[in-house]
Regions:
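Hydrophobic side chains in well-ordered alpha-helices
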Residues: 18-21, 97-101
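A short acidic-to-branched-hydrophobic micro-motif
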Residues: 62-66
Length: 139
């Protein structure tokens, strides 16, 4: 099982303002590809239908998203990745990672494939309450 830093997510109440700020200051480019296709983005079925801007500096991804303080509640999960934001690691063995969390007694929210096409996503909190996403693509 390996891990690689994938992205930083910030949640905002004013997505155009936040995106413009970072694009202007850091010259971030917009990501538009199949991998970043939202699942049912216009539907309430996913528990989150806010807008998301996918940006990159060429090496690191940034996912700026409209804040939704009720995503966890709507998904019946205790971790809400769309309230304060999160950072993300990508793995090649999400099931193995979930077994490790179980063995260590670390609670997590199994969101499955809910927001990005083909990404299986799990969210947890570190001891200080910071939200961490682990996902495996191609699922």
């Amino acid at each position: 099982m390996n891990f690689k830093f994938h992205h930083l997510n910030l949640c905002t109440d004013n997505l155009p303002r936040l995106t413009k700020f970072y694009q202007t200051l850091f010259d971030l480019g917009t990501i538009r590809d199949e991998e970043h296709t939202r699942v049912n983005a216009e539907s309430t079925k996913t528990g989150y239908n806010g807008k998301v801007d996918f940006l990159s500096d060429g090496a690191i991804e940034f996912h700026w998203a409209e804040r939704d303080i009720n995503t966890g509640f709507k998904m019946k999960q205790f971790v809400n990745p769309m309230s304060r934001g999160h950072f993300c690691f990508r793995t090649n063995d999400i099931k193995g990672f979930m077994r490790k969390l179980d063995e260590l007694g670390i609670p997590y929210s199994d969101y499955g494939k809910w927001a990005i096409a083909g990404w299986y996503q799990v969210f947890l909190q570190d001891p200080d309450g910071n939200v961490i996403e682990i996902h495996q693509p191609g699922m």
